[in-house]
């Protein structure tokens, strides 16, 4: 069909209109990409941790549990439902208690896939919450550090020192009360007496999950013998080590020496374990059948505390 000059003009106008639409479509998808983990981004901040809840620096708490809550110190990295990327769940953290090893790095995403119980991530607030139990009456130093997925780490991470003094009187406990170890490694705990007076004998009954850990060995270390032999006596002990059922029993007495017996704080025996089960937590328990007696054969134990092993 023969095209008129009017048809040609219409085609030119239509082509121009389509070109405008195409150009606008290109502009709509050509948006700016924001990456707060990239140091080149205008809103980038170095890794920094803001602690919202933990014991007061230098203070003494009267509880065997402590809660620590933290997040990034820059609100641009906090949880925001309008953000295309949830930066809060992608930041990695690790913590350390006293001289123990650093925990593995865990992001919020990683914690949501695990079942650690004691360390959780709240998707609605973007907060990390850590609860530590079985803390004994000693001084503590806690630290937490962050890093980005790009492996840029925090240089000046927060730390705090505090003291636990939860109970008065004679205590029999697993020490340290919190043990952190890598999967498949060997670790140890001590059975410990605190603030005992005129001690002469103990029946210790310890149980553990032998599908999680195996007792490799036990020993009276030098710190134990120094404590137990301070009255210049000698030690008599009987041991029942039932690894098949996860139970260790020790009957120990201090014979001879000073009439006043042993007083103070010290370790009784060291228990050396190997982790053999799944990752997670497991308790090393001291039975209520355990007893501590003084030179007059009186039972003097007032508090018994178990311990917990956390395997990363």
Feature map (PLM): residue ranges:
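N-terminal processing/targeting junctions
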Residues: 14, 76, 148-149, 277-279
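C-terminal motif of bacterial Sec signal peptides marking the signal peptidase cleavage site
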Residues: 20-23
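A generic structural signal for short, non-catalytic loop/turn and secondary-structure boundary residues
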Residues: 14, 61, 88, 243-245, ...
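Low-complexity, disordered linker/stalk regions enriched in Pro/Thr/Ser/Gly
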Residues: 25-167
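Acidic, low-complexity intrinsically disordered segments
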Residues: 165-312
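N-terminal hydrophobic targeting signals that begin at the initiator methionine
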Residues: 1-2, 25
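Bacterial N-terminal signal peptides that target proteins for export
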Residues: 2-13
